[in-house]
């Protein structure tokens, strides 16, 4: 299949692009390199397009599937308005491209929509939005739901993803990454008070596998992507 990965120089996007290529697909990556890094794509043989999908993005190729990972993901990004508008506009542009080419569209949402909500977290539970990033993803999900009967569109609410190619996320990298970095440097790991806060941590290769499987779902949907296992920070270290 011919596949486009947006945000493909980022953390999940690069792992996804490399795995899709390993499986024999013809893959193109688009990234504006705002937070992604081409070093994440070492070994990638497909086309790289330097562009911002939130702007007037055009591509001449026809793709069978689009994996939309591009977004401002750092909840501490200083401009909430820009975070919301770029994320929502980029998604709408990918919807337009998918409609034009009759492509399957699989996009990154977030389990951050549940905030401090009840566990186990279910897709239909009340949302607890804590950031502009969360608001943008909720708007994307609402837009997707209106298209369920019109196109193949799948939203993936990732929980706490960790693994290779994460370091360029810097402060927005996972707690697993930061704890491992501190331990490797000989420092005592810094955790939240008492370290009893629980999170669902999923390895990036498992998240990529789940993302690829979304190409073959029978019905458009929005689903959680995690392990279903809550681990506290004390257990991590």
Residue ranges of model-derived segments:
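N-terminal Rossmann-like NAD(P)+-binding domain of SDR-like oxidoreductases, especially those catalyzing
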Residues: 1-159
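Short, hydrophobic secondary-structure boundary micro-motifs
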Residues: 107, 190-193, 223-224
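NAD(P)-dependent short-chain dehydrogenase/reductase
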Residues: 132, 142-199, 204-215, 230
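Mid/C-terminal beta-alpha module of Rossmann-like enzyme folds, strongest
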Residues: 216-237
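Ser/Thr-centric signal marking residues that sit
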Residues: 6, 110, 136, 198, ...
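Structured beta->alpha junctions
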Residues: 9, 33, 195-196, 229
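Residue-level preference for the first positions of well-ordered beta-strands
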Residues: 2, 188, 220-222
């Amino acid at each position: 299949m011919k596949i486009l990965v947006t945000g493909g120089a980022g953390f999940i996007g690069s792992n996804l692009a490399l795995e899709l290529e390993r499986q024999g697909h013809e893959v193109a990556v688009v990234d504006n390199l705002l937070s992604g890094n081409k070093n994440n794509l070492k070994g990638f043989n497909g086309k790289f397009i330097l562009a911002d999908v939130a702007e007037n993005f055009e591509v001449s190729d026809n793709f069978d599937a689009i994996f939309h990972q591009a977004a401002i993901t750092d909840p501490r990004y200083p401009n909430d308005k820009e975070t919301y508008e770029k994320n929502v506009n980029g998604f709408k542009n990918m919807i337009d491209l998918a409609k034009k080419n009759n492509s399957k569209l699989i996009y990154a949402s977030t389990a951050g929509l549940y905030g401090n909500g009840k566990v186990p977290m279910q897709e239909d539970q009340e949302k607890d939005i804590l950031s502009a990033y969360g608001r943008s993803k909720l708007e994307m999900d609402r837009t997707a739901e209106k298209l369920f009967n019109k196109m193949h569109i799948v939203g993936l609410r990732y929980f706490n993803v960790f693994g290779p190619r994460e370091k360029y996320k810097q402060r927005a990298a996972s707690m697993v990454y930061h704890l491992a970095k501190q331990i490797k440097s000989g420092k005592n790991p810094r955790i939240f008070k008492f370290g009893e806060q629980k999170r669902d941590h999923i390895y990036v290769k498992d998240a990529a596998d789940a993302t690829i499987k979304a190409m073959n779902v029978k019905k458009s949907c929005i689903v959680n992507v995690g392990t279903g296992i809550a681990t506290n920070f004390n257990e991590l270290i």
